[in-house]
Amino acid sequence: MASDSAGATISGNFSNSDNSETLNLNTTKLYSSAISSISPQFPSPKPTSSCPSIPNSKRIPNTNFIVDLFRLPHQSSSVAFFLSHFHSDHYSGLSSSWSKGIIYCSHKTARLVAEILQVPSQFVFALPMNQMVKIDGSEVVLIEANHCPGAVQFLFKVKLESSGFEKYVHTGDFRFCDEMRFDPFLNGFVGCDGVFLDTTYCNPKFVFPSQEESVGYVVSVIDKISEEKVLFLVATYVVGKEKILVEIARRCKRKIVVDARKMSMLSVLGCGEEGMFTEDENESDVHVVGWNVLGETWPYFRPNFVKMNEIMVEKGYDKVVGFVPTGWTYEVKRNKFAVRFKDSMEIHLVPYSEHSNYDELREFIKFLKPKRVIPTVGVDIEKFDCKEVNKMQKHFSGLVDEMANKKDFLLGFYRQSYQKNEKSDVDVVSHSAEVYEEEEKNACEDGGENVPSSRGPILHDTTPSSDSRLLIKLRDSLPAWVTEEQMLDLIKKHAGNPVDIVSNFYEYEAELYKQASLPTPSLNNQAVLFDDDVTDLQPNPVKGICPDVQAIQKGFDLPRKMNLTKGTISPGKRGKSSGSKSNKKAKKDPKSKPVGPGQPTLFKFFNKVLDGGSNSVSVGSETEECNTDKKMVHIDASEAYKEVTDQFIDIVNGSESLRDYAASIIDEAKGDISRALNIYYSKPREIPGDHAGERGLSSKTIQYPKCSEACSSQEDKKASENSGHAVNICVQTSAEESVDKNYVSLPPEKYQPKEHACWREGQPAPYIHLVRTFASVESEKGKIKAMSMLCNMFRSLFALSPEDVLPAVYLCTNKIAADHENIELNIGGSLISSALEEACGISRSTVRDMYNSLGDLGDVAQLCRQTQKLLVPPPPLLVRDVFSTLRKISVQTGTGSTRLKKNLIVKLMRSCREKEIKFLVRTLARNLRIGAMLRTVLPALGRAIVMNSFWNDHNKELSESCFREKLEGVSAAVVEAYNILPSLDVVVPSLMDKDIEFSTSTLSMVPGIPIKPMLAKIAKGVQEFFNLSQEKAFTCEYKYDGQRAQIHKLLDGTVCIFSRNGDETTSRFPDLVDVIKQFSCPAAETFMLDAEVVATDRINGNKLMSFQELSTRERGSKDALITTESIKVEVCVFVFDIMFVNGEQLLALPLRERRRRLKEVFPETRPGYLEYAKEITVGAEEASLNNHDTLSRINAFLEEAFQSSCEGIMVKSLDVNAGYCPTKRSDSWLKVKRDYVDGLGDTLDLVPIGAWYGNGRKAGWYSPFLMACFNPETEEFQSVCRVMSGFSDAFYIEMKEFYSEDKILAKKPPYYRTGETPDMWFSAEVVWEIRGADFTVSPVHSASLGLVHPSRGISVRFPRFISKVTDRNPEECSTATDIAEMFHAQTRKMNITSQH
């Protein structure tokens, strides 16, 4: 039928629907004819050159075809409109005034559009079903959508301007069914360029049953309740759900009552004439009602029993049963068919849907294997590249043809290079699966099998110039073993961003190296691989491609083992993806074998079952045969699954002696390597002799001797060892399953470092060794026993894997680097929770509920850990791998860093065994909660060295007393060495090198590595330190309200500044660096000082400012130094001690001598810039409690300190016991602060109004509490501070019981005023007495808001709980006015006069 015929009406189309001649339609001519028939005087429209701007999800690429979108601003004669079905959300915009273009649709939909919507028939063109039609040069086929009457899927084969075709499937709304797999037209679109997919239920929670099951349920309910005076109501759309109505009428043998509108619709569809439907309400008790009559279904079902009761009474029935057939109300539940009851009414939520559920969508994409999926529902289609679209497309990762996309990408290199060389005689077409049989004759005339001899030159020639430059840079940056193909794949993955390329490379370095080390595959091998992607319905060669180009298409060995986005795929999706590939590859002819040696094709790697090959023999079927027959079986199986057997042996680290046994297992598993591994590990006693010493060692797959709890006798143990019986810990075991006995709990004298370890000498240490120790230490209350366990753990590491000792120490101490390196994981609880959700397949709400109950994310992870079935069990976690991964996480910054961190964490989690995930999560959260930190780990490390050396070398030379002395001496030396040189990178290797000769003199202080600061004890008054300093000379110094700083000068002149925690803060104080350089003596080439940095107001006589002022100073970082010009808060440094100068360690010198050396380093000072701490000296003869002059002098000095805005004073011994002791808190240093002195500290009466869940030791309790005062003017509670000190464990337990049930509020009351957001809110019930150091202005807390500062409240620094106040009601607590007055009364406060 010619496209320019005048009969472009519905009736005209009907008359030609059976015509065997192919329809060839021209939309512009049809539109011109339609316009002319309506108004002959109407000028013929001018064809437009392009389609109006529309969403990508509505437009077919490279065409002017628009699907299901009719609200365009103007008409266009060249635009072809396609309507998939007659539902209002798809035909919105159509009306009787439509004249914007020609509408193509099915016959039934055309009738509905014309008769119901009154769209002029001249603009509606009905297309035949299952028949190819050419429209504007493109081929279009309509097939059944299984949605509603007249609903169709559109198959578009679009001709490109240059040459070739692109294929697209537009599903409209559809429900996938098995019949579609056999549709010949749809089969022709396997491997298409894109699928515009109905993603209504693209969510794993929507997996409702089949339509047949749902219809059967409705019919069974009607048959079961068929009584008199029972009315059945079925909710449906105006068009839709007809299938369920027809089945009810047919199987229940009764008519269906519909209203006039529904009847007219059914008549148009041809259903009303079958006698199944009636408008007479008295003819049947099954009535159809509107969609929302029985209740609202979105976003969740809300029944409308009121309306149901009205209908029941109006129609005179005693009972009413409603059915709401929809998938929206269904999620994975125990009861598929939920029922709501009320009185004599019930509503059945029937999971009947005419849209595909989640699994069906994935099956459909798996069947078609398109290059991409374009969602059409459930996202903002105006933002096609938005995150929601990308997130939805990830549901189909592994199901789309990603390899074809890579081929197209690399072929683009060839095209660009070919065009530059003006080799235009080769017509390159990228989509080989799209060529029809009639085009075979147009194939390249050259013919033959001209295969390039080398891939190297081709790759070089086909790379664009920009990528060539990038390749050169990558060759300089990456290791030499990285192949050019791998570089190209990385360039594509990261859009040429070299930073992302390099960072992602190192994330997957091990996998890339393993791939690069495989033999180079032959081109024939790759030809087989790519041929697997072409279905039997499309066997034709590519049109117009010369053999050279075909060879390139088939010859590229793109990375297949590594998926750079695999971290974003959920466990369920990963498993299904693997399964889909396996099933597809299994259909291939087993006789097709690659030629020559090389890397196995994907078919062979994923192959599970060979189709009845002659070599496939079941071991189980030969159990009665003689040994010779069994050997033949093994040989045959080995030949049939040779490559799988090789892989199996490699995974379990077996030798050739294991081959026969492995072949029998693999044959029993029919080539399924995962099943074979399960058999191997479930039947360990059957493993033949395979001596451990003969097995290869691998850093990724290790075997560990299995000594179960049941093997108590030495005979069993020896039998296990002699059999070579070993277990690979990559086998999933539950926490409750019997695991290797944890021998670290043995007494040190009975522990054998090598025999009791779970790995062998020379192998890398498994992470499970640490985890089992952590679990034992966690359950052990005694510190001595815990140290013994840690000692045993380290002994095995020293004996078997000394290179893993340092990473193990870091993991035991919850560190990944020395403090001064400022390297942190920088991950929060939300990221850990998100990774846990993906790794374990649980919901966020479940994680939150479990965390609220358990209070520890590690316990949550352990509880919800699930077995995840993968193609190959993941390798066991190694100590060094866990540590290196944590270091990788710490360096991830910038765009995409959160995703990369999450991927690394998920990868670790999925490899966890036993309790590994519990302690891994705790490590990520920086809280192991085993009660063993550095003070326990370091002595255990020293003990391990002595124990191993004693038993190995000195058993006869050392007496018991000497041994004990050495044990304690080395342990103490390790701790002391770390205090003066807190770098495990230095201490641990030195300890291993010196062995039992290690001592404190082994290491010395190093400028640039801060030592641990000396600490002071608290004194509650002046008299207290007189009692401790009788007849001993001492000094009193101001205790400044600033930041403790340790200042180092390095040999190269560099000045570094460290905080009291060892964090480097040099970038925050560039002005201080200049001051140190200016005033230090040139002769002092290196030194280490102890000082306090204080904010100062140099304009107002160098007045000292509060710590609050100093905290407003910019912090800076290694990558962003602040400049002296940008500094707004000036500082003065008060130096008071020196620990190291010019290579000499001064720690043992008395303070008096250290002061003298300090003044040699700084002979001059300058007020407001660098000063010595203000002090007074008390001689030994004056240090007496009876000396009232001295007592008065010190009291005056203390008051002077308060008036100078200091926290208090420091009292230090000058001569006796006056050394500098890192980390020590001794009587040699005492501190007297305002809130420690009786009579000086004011207390507040505050009300707890909320709390957070505790962490660490306080897990399961509430800590901290949010405290508030009361403002009687506004009648509201205003927050003052968080309190987390001063409580006992008994008090925590009491408060957990007290604040429960009705005392916990669902949300913050309107009369609570705060910027805090605690985990839960409490009703105002009790009053507590709180004491703090002083008051400060707060942007978060709201106490006294407007009374002191116009926009900020007042808070308390260092608050602590004193006691309960039982004689006051909550409204009688401290008021906002009280707090304001106390703020003004304090001597040290932030200057807020200039604040606005």
Swiss-Prot record:
Protein name: DNA ligase 6
Binding site for Mg(2+) 2: 1207
Effect of disrupting the coding gene: Normal vegetative growth and fertility. Slightly enhanced sensitivity to X-rays, leading to a slight root growth reduction after 100-Gy dose of X-ray irradiation. Delayed germination of seeds, especially upon cold and oxidative stress (e.g. by menadione, a genotoxic agent), and reduced seed longevity and storability. Increased DNA damage response in germinating seeds, probably due to accumulation of DNA damage in seeds. Increased stable root transformation susceptibility by A.tumefaciens A208 T-DNA.
Family of this protein: Belongs to the ATP-dependent DNA ligase family.
MF term (GO), any: DNA ligase (ATP) activity
Enzyme class: ligase
PROSITE patterns the UniProt entry points to: DNA_LIGASE_A1, DNA_LIGASE_A3
Active site positions, chain numbering: 1039 (n6-amp-lysine intermediate)
EC number: 6.5.1.1
Chemical reaction(s) catalysed: ATP + (deoxyribonucleotide)n-3'-hydroxyl + 5'-phospho-(deoxyribonucleotide)m = (deoxyribonucleotide)n+m + AMP + diphosphate
Magnesium listed as a keyword: yes
Motif (Nuclear localization signal 1): 572-579
Residues that, per the record, bind ATP: 1037, 1044, 1060, 1092, 1136, 1212, 1225, 1231
Keywords attached to this entry: ATP-binding, DNA damage, DNA recombination, DNA repair, DNA replication, Ligase, Magnesium, Metal-binding, Nucleotide-binding, Nucleus
Pfam family, one: DNA_ligase_A_N
Gene3D superfamilies per the UniProt record, alphabetical: 3.30.1490.70, 3.40.50.12650, DNA ligase, ATP-dependent, N-terminal domain, DNA ligase/mRNA capping enzyme, Nucleic acid-binding proteins, Ribonuclease Z/Hydroxyacylglutathione hydrolase-like
Binding site for Mg(2+) 1: 1092
A Gene Ontology biological process term: seed germination
Motif mapping: Nuclear localization signal 2: 886-893
Gene coding for it: LIG6
Region annotation Disordered: where it falls in the sequence: 441-464, 562-599
Tissue: Mostly expressed in buds and flowers, and, to a lower extent, in stems, leaves, siliques and seeds.
Induction per the UniProt record: Induced by UV-C. Induced during seed imbibition. Induced slightly by bleomycin (BLM), a radiomimetic reagent that generates DNA double-strand breaks (DSBs).
InterPro entries listed in its UniProt record: ATP-dep_DNA_ligase, DNA_ligase_ATP-dep, DNA_ligase_ATP-dep_C, DNA_ligase_ATP-dep_cent, DNA_ligase_ATP-dep_CS, DNA_ligase_ATP-dep_N, DNA_ligase_N_sf, DRMBL
Gene source species: Arabidopsis thaliana (Mouse-ear cress)
Function: DNA ligase that seals nicks in double-stranded DNA during DNA replication, DNA recombination and DNA repair. Required to maintain seed viability (e.g. longevity and storability) and during seed germination, probably by repairing DNA damage accumulated during seed development, storage and/or imbibition. Facilitates seed germination in cold conditions (2 degrees Celsius) and under oxidative stress (e.g. menadione, a genotoxic agent). Involved in repair of X-ray-induced damage. Limits stable root transformation by A.tumefaciens T-DNA.
Swiss-Prot/TrEMBL cofactor(s): Mg(2+)
